[in-house]
């Protein structure tokens, strides 16, 4: 476990798990450093990471936290993360232009992310781990529009309700938008939200 047995969902959501910022982009095979690819390899590498400090005692912004949260959602629900988010979050909120891997008819509306592989990327995740694993991860890869994001924000501002439909309990919104990080940690975080930067 390398000190990971005490990590909780709350630690992952507040970046207080103690895990490193990210997984390595290369692995050593027979003494040679090589690139890797594939979702399963990303999960294997994330699970293999050691903690830098005991969970709950410090803050490290870590993609690994949300990579693992995405995997937990898939394990618990039995659904691919892309399907779960579409069916359980985006469609119920009327966010019709939000998701992973934008379709060709939405790509022209997607803001370019960066120059990579000899061209400006549009509709391709900016994060190298997400790109290597098919574009769907808990920590990166999602695309949306201003209109869809506004719907999500309205739901949060209305304590979990949008257009008369209850999507989240007010207590859930409070946990997201108020300090949930341990008192020993300088960075103030809600569950999945940054509070003070």
Give the ranges of each region predicted by the language model.
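Short, surface-exposed loop or secondary-structure junction motifs
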Residues: 2-197
């Amino acid at each position: 476990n390398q000190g990971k047995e005490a990590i909780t969902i709350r630690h992952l959501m507040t970046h207080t798990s103690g895990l490193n910022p990210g997984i390595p982009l290369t692995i050593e095979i027979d003494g040679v450093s090589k690139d890797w690819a594939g979702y399963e390899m990303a999960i294997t590498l994330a699970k293999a990471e050691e903690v830098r400090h005991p969970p709950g005692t410090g803050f490290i912004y870590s993609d690994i936290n949300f990579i693992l949260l995405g995997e937990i959602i898939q394990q618990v629900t039995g659904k691919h993360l892309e399907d779960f988010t579409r069916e359980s979050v985006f469609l119920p909120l009327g966010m019709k232009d939000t998701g992973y891997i934008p379709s060709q008819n939405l790509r022209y509306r997607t803001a370019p992310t960066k120059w990579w592989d000899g061209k400006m990327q549009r509709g391709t995740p900016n994060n190298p781990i997400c790109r290597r694993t098919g574009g769907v991860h808990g920590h990166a890869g999602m695309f949306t529009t201003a209109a869809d994001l506004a719907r999500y924000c309205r739901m949060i501002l209305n304590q979990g309700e949008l257009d008369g439909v209850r999507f989240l309990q007010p207590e859930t919104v409070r946990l997201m938008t108020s300090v949930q990080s341990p008192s020993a940690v300088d960075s103030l975080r809600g569950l999945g939200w940054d509070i003070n930067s």
